[in-house]
Amino acid sequence: MFFTQPPHLVKAEELKQEPPKGTAYSVAIPGTEQPGRSRVYRAWNAQKELLTTLDPQVTTAHDMFESTANRQPKNHCLGWRPYNSTTKTWDPYQWLTYETVQKRRAAFGAGLVELHQKHNCHRPGQYGVGLWAQNRPEWQITDLACISQSLYSVSIYDVLAPDATEYIINHAELNCVVTSLPHIPTLLKLKSSLPNLKMIVSLDPLDGPEQNGHSKRALLESMAAGLDLAIYTIDQVEELGLASKRGYNAPSASDIVTINYTSGTTGPPKGVVLTHGNAVAATSCGLTTIGQARGDTMCSYLPLAHIYARLAEHTAFWGGARIGYFHGNIVELVDDLKLLKPTGFMSVPRLYSRFGTAIRAATVEQPGFKGALSRHIVAAKMANMKNPDPSKATIKHALYDRIWAKKVAAALGLERAKYMISGSAPLDPTLHNFLRVATGTDVVQGYGLTESYASATAQSTQDLSSGNCGRLAPCTEACLVSLPDMEYSVEDKPFPRGELLLRGNNMFREYYKNDDETSKAVTEDGWFRTGDVCTVDAQGRFIIIDRRKNVLKLAQGEYISPERLEGVILSELGYVAQAYVHGDSSETFLVGIFGVAPDLFAPYASKVLGKTIAPTDVEGLKEHLNDDKLRRAVLRDLERVAKKHKFAGYERVRNVSLKVDPFTVENNLLTPTLKLKRPPVVKMYRTLLDQLYGQANEEQSAPRAKL
């Protein structure tokens, strides 16, 4: 069956094209430089005007979904795997059509307004609805429902600690939280500290075959008695909306689409106010980077409370793709991927590193013919990719892709994937290139922040370089500002270096109820200070080289970027699942606390110690992590990595402690997006860090035997 691509997708393909020969991806606009500030950069095809939308008729997230639902109502939209209580397994995917989702979101949106009126919480203008659940179809139905009535969602990370949940609900003044069943008891316990909360809407059924008084609803309502708090299910609210006959109250481009609370690595979360105009601009750029179309499939597993995942689903909706949700267990994600066979995949370096480790173990590290053939294929494809003639460079190979790379991709469920995208942290160049040749798939790296609606830069699928974040999105402009205290200058040669500043149609409005933080983050002329230190190469590609906010200064005055070192270590040592590199200002070297991956570290430890430790024997592994033989073996690996990446002497980790899961969301050392909270890590592990320094200093001062 043939169909015509809608005009906005045709325009996206046009904007996706490579620049003319001799033109950089991002162009410095003459005459825009200022003292201490570089020229302003824009995408080569947006030099005159930044992109606002791919379709003048589409200016809101409401429009994006409606245009697709009206164009292809019978197509698959949202999919999930039901749990089979008989077999204790997850069934194949079931799907809701765009038409069904459209009707349900309209009913639920109307019902939410009716509910607020019923409890005397409805007020003129916009207000927020809390959304606290793991990725699932009802998450998007709720978000789309809010949008349909000019309400905005306030997402709460599924794994957020109770104190942070309490802070967000109170700060955003939420009267209603839509949530999954496991979170309802937590909300009931917190109710005494949540004066504004009047309604909870459960995404899960509360009525079952239990006897009277023993249903989930009865138990929860008994807990809620006297708390001035009503509990409903999504079905009840949808029925309320249908009965109301209430139509859409569509938003405008300047209306809020969401308040997205940042992870809060150093303090309380900040509420990033994002508008419908921001959403449309960022989604337009997403479609110019990767494209989405009818017949495409994406897998949703990255937390939807993170704007990176939300942008991905906006892009799927406006492109006409379908979204299949993982069944909730990240360890079994590949099972979902093998069923879905997505046409594209978005992830983070941490997962790509595990993919790379698994692929190497199954191919190039195998003994005998299988390993030899794999190494030959990787070497041949790597040579093709690095062909000095860009017109001949390719990750494809007519024979090797068919007999080898296709099988590698299929083992991950990614044999249909046209692209893989990495974001949220730098992707190691060696891993980047290996994934390209091993899977035969375009792997691109992007850069964005919550404040930029996850959109700022992205590599072209035709650009086979690595170690950079690619070109500017056509909705965004950028410049660099000198940092004299860190010895970065926009006058540096061969390329300018400085803090990256962003401005554009995708950029946030403000931090909610926080003028002080807003004024710190945004200059008077509208530039957002990212805190990331960048350079821009001759092709107009942006490269993150440092982080202004997380720089250590050692005793002899050397500046260290621990996040850069941690990223390299995580990508090189597959058995390291978590890495924290620490430097005291009174010391001349670094120490580290590493969390090991039991399934990968157990074989390594068995080899070093000469005894068998089963990958599933986590407690047994923990007993051996303090063995000095293991510590010294890991330090040798760290030294090898340091030499390979040409770390300076003061950048080398001289002592290390090995643990299983030392940093978790539950112990408040990780944000919900799994970023380290560095000050709390130091506070919790201060004694251990002192011991690591003491041990290393003793070992360095101990006399060495002469040979």
UniProtKB/Swiss-Prot annotation:
Q: Which GO terms describe its molecular function?
A: ATP binding; CoA-ligase activity; ligase activity; long-chain fatty acid-CoA ligase activity; polyketide synthase activity
Q: Which Pfam families match?
A: AMP-binding
Keywords, A to Z, come to: ATP-binding, Ligase, Magnesium, Nucleotide-binding, Peroxisome
Compartments, record wording: Peroxisome matrix
Q: According to the UniProt record, where is the region Fatty acid-binding?
A: 525-549
Q: Answer whether the UniProt record assigns the keyword Signal to this protein.
A: no
Q: Which residues bind ATP?
A: I259, N260, Y261, T262, S263, G264, T265, T266, G267, P268, P269, K270
Protein family according to the UniProt entry: Belongs to the ATP-dependent AMP-binding enzyme family.
Name of the featured protein? Acyl-CoA ligase 891, peroxisomal
Q: Which organism is it from?
A: Penicillium brevicompactum
